[in-house]
Amino acid sequence: MSTTVETARSSVIVAIDGPSGTGKSSTSKAVAAKLGLSYLDTGAQYRAITWWMLTNGVDVGNPEEIATAAAKPVIVSGTDPAAPTITVDGEDASGPIRTQEVTSKVSAVSAVPEVRTLITALQRSIAAAATGGIVVEGRDIGTTVLPDADLKIFLTASPEARAARRSGEVKGSDLSATREALIKRDAADSGRKTSPLAKADDAVEVDTTELTLQQVIECVVTLVEGKRVAA
């Protein structure tokens, strides 16, 4: 009987949303690893389909062309938080999807409804298959992808803090330019008609501006453990 209870408690689904530079990926991976949960970076999937389109000559400025090509690539995400993977048509895409070119085009591609429908279905299938529980990070997880998640968390931070973190991740990047790029991405993601970046009404908001990564991780772990106990 106790084993069944433990399984029920461990199979929690956690949705972590928020804009770039708030610590979503680092926090989500660390929390999943610490609690023995699977991990899914949904942003990587949108980057992957964007990279595929750029590589295959799709005009990413043309929504109709994007919609027509959306179902062609086969995207597979590995959910081990210690070593998450992503492949496109069997090819490792973990490096190529992080280029500046992909970063500058991903919002346009991900705003196309046909793309979001396909990727959302993929994300839901991965979450459903994670019988031991999963941490899913993105921009519309709590509102659109997994509205029935056991716990929804929305990470925020000031534009300055986010830009500083992003600049630290990318060698030679300009802080001011990074800040402007983040603000532009926020506007694009929040303003799109299909599944915009938004905080779910029942999400717990965590402002990470003045917190260290470890403090954010500890905060989220506490929230997840509290949800498990209440389950």
Curated annotation (Swiss-Prot):
Which terms does the record give in the GO molecular function aspect? ATP binding; CMP kinase activity; dCMP kinase activity
Q: What is its EC number?
A: 2.7.4.25
Kindly indicate whether the keyword 4Fe-4S belongs to this entry: no
Q: Name one GO biological process term.
A: pyrimidine nucleotide metabolic process
Keyword Flavoprotein in record: no
Q: Which residues bind ATP?
A: 18-26
- Kindly give the CDD domains that the UniProt entry links to this protein: CMPK (cd02020)
Out of the domains of life, which is the source? Bacteria
* Compartment list: Cytoplasm
The record lists the catalysed reaction(s) as:
CMP + ATP = CDP + ADP; dCMP + ATP = dCDP + ADP
First-level EC class: transferase
Gene Ontology CC entries for this record: cytosol
- Keywords annotated in UniProt: ATP-binding, Cytoplasm, Kinase, Nucleotide-binding, Transferase
Q: Which PANTHER family match?
A: CYTIDYLATE KINASE (PTHR21299:SF2), CYTIDYLATE KINASE/PANTOATE-BETA-ALANINE LIGASE (PTHR21299)
Sorted alphabetically, which NCBIfam families does this protein's record hold?
cmk (TIGR00017)
Question: Which HAMAP family did the record assign?
Answer: Cytidyl_kinase_type1
Similarity annotation: Belongs to the cytidylate kinase family. Type 1 subfamily.
Spell out the protein name for this chain. Answer: Cytidylate kinase
- Source organism of the structure: Streptomyces griseus subsp. griseus (strain JCM 4626 / CBS 651.72 / NBRC 13350 / KCC S-0626 / ISP 5235)
